[in-house]
Structure formats: structure tokens, C-alpha cells
Amino acid sequence: MSLLTNLGVAGLRMMSSRFLAGLLIAVFAATTAGAVEYAGVPAGTLTSVLANDADNAPIAVIRYAMRVTPVTQLELQQFVVAHPEWQRGRIARTFADGGYLQQWRTPVDLGDAALGQRPATNVSWFAAQAFCEAEGGRLPTWAQWEYAAAADATRRDARGDPAWLAKILAWYARPATTALPAVGGAANVYGVRDLHGLVWEWVDDFNALLVSPDSRTGDDPEKLKFCGAGAINLQDRQNYAVLMRIALLSSLDAADSTSSLGFRCVRSLPTETP
């Protein structure tokens, strides 16, 4: 930031607004590149709750890096300052609904310092994707999110443990009016935190999640909103918490925002060679 200091007021006035915007973007990218912590997630296979075919064959997941924690309110504030087109009041209506960042005092002021380390919410898919791209990443695919979220502190796949599943389900008993805590919960075996128990999270391919109703119910499948080729296996009751996430995501449009929906980013890693 010494460049801005040395320029002085007169020098800043001579700069074009476009150059200043570009400079802010560069500062944001350089700052986040060094400060944000990502954890490496090794390659493996995933038996997803999404039945991709009749046999529900395991999915191959290549190695990637995932943000250790969800994006915070403070980090999102820094992003919209550097990218004014994503500020509340400036963002195109196509990219955000009326609830976008409504919890902030102004388009660039959180209004409460306590919000800073809490997960960013009330953010659309479009804004979340733009943030990740500015950070050199992208939103995770559903398979990447589910793969990382299957792990506990010691196991890469803890989904067969009833006690672990019960702990996750306990999150749903928390009153909706309870203020969200700061990010930084216990890490799983990969070093990733807060995949459960804090907020729902956007995924890149949220609109490719297909909700398939339980054949034992009277639900009309035409009343369910879906697109894509995946189908949720609603018979898999032990993964109820994950199914709830898919049901929520499949009901959303990319411009939607809610007070319980946040996001985190992933980055590609070089493919390992034998």
C-alpha cells in the first residue's frame, strides 16, 4: 500500500477511475493470495448420495485445495470495496435479489465489528463465484464439497458412524434466530473447518442437482424444481443432513441469497504423477 501513500492527494486525483479500480483489484488479489489458507485434499473416490447411475458407482475425485474456512464478512467487504460493481445498490438485479448483503449498515460498511469474522451470508451465487475468481479459485463442485464434508477429525469417510451423523444433525436443532459464530471450528482430517454446523454453502453446480421424490410418498415430481442428470437417493436416510443441503440448493436460483447460506472457494492442484 506504500504506492498509494507516496502518490499523495494530487497524484491520486490525476489517476483515472479505471486505473484506480484496477489497482484496488490488484491489491485485493495480492493480499488474499498470501493471507488466505487453503488445505490440500488428496484424490480419492466418493460414493455420493447423488445416484449418478443405476449402480451409484463411486466417483473419482482428483486432488484439489479447499479454503480452510468459509469466506468471512470482512473478506467479502474487502472484495466489494475493490470491486464496486458487486456492492449492494450497484450490483445488477440479474445477479442478486433484494436481500443481498442486507445485514450491512451500508454497501461497504459492516456496521458491527463482530460481524467481521462471521461467515459471509446473504450473498448470491454470482457474487460468490466472482469472489472466488478474484482470489484465484472457484466455487467447489458438489462432489468436491461432499467428498471433503464426509471426513471427521481422523477419518476420510465417517459417514458410517451414527454418532458422527447425530452430531451433525444436532445443528438443525439450533434456533434460526441464533447469531452465527465466528469461523474456525474444529478441523477435519484434511484441515478443513466448518463444513458442518455453521452455514449452508454454495457449490458451483448447484443447479445440476436433481431432486427425486421418494416413491412411497404422494409427491408430484412435476412440482419439484430440478435440472441436470443427478438424482438424490432419498432412501439413504443416514445422510439426511447432506440431503437437506441438496434440497435447499436445488430450490435456489443463482441470484438468491439467504441469512444461512455462505460459501468457500477451491483451487486446482497439479495432477499427481506415478
Enumerate the predicted regions with their spans.
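Active-site microenvironments of metalloenzymes and redox enzymes
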Residues: R63-W164, R267-T271
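Bacterial N-terminal signal peptides
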Residues: L20-A30
